[in-house]
Amino acid sequence: MSKWENGECLPDVYNLKLLAQILHISVDSLLDTEIQNPEKIVETITIGGANFEIVEKPETLLAGKIIYAKNFANEDSFNSAIDSLTEDDKQAAFEKLKETVLPIYDINLSVNFWLNFKQRAYGFVRGVTTEEQSDGIDVYKMPASLFIRAYTDKATSQLISKEQCEIWELFAYIRDYFMPSHGFKMAENGAQEMEVFDTFDHKTGYAYMPVERI
């Protein structure tokens, strides 16, 4: 806490809610800052108790370690490179980031996974406010877009016959069932799928699917 007060470090996002409850203040007041890159919920669609939020999200810069399929001979070697990246590798990249967006969230970025293999990329990233990053840090500029956002709670998990699902498991349901039923198709503006984790152990969080209305 003393390092935080002295400006030597920032609090972990996963502890903010608990700290705010203990101190009986909002998270914004706790940080003494406005949440950066705010997004706007324009509609909520409920299916069997599961909420799917239609979100307008402004342009976002994501930075960290991004692996590009074009640098690999085949899909298997690309997938192996993703799997071989260790937690230490990811944290080493995160520690080099400049001007990280608050609050801090770990994000898995899936680029063009519904397209040809060579057009794909996969990243372990966080939001930042500048493209000027350290050597070895990859940056992806996510355009402003409409997204479908879904959380990994029990009601949503039960839609895919689970009590608790992982974020990535929601993408197929959203793409194959939710979108056709509610007048959406994949966005074609360069926006990408994101897994945004809200716990330190990456057990829960939000699936973001970039879409446009039909």
Put a short name on every predicted segment.
Residues M1-L10, I35:
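Recognition helix of helix-turn-helix/homeodomain-like DNA-binding domains
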Residues N6, L10-V13, L18, K40:
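Extreme N-terminal leader/targeting regions
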Residues Y14-S29:
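DNA major-groove recognition helix of helix-turn-helix/homeodomain DNA-binding modules
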Residues S29, I35-I214:
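A solvent-exposed interaction/effector surface
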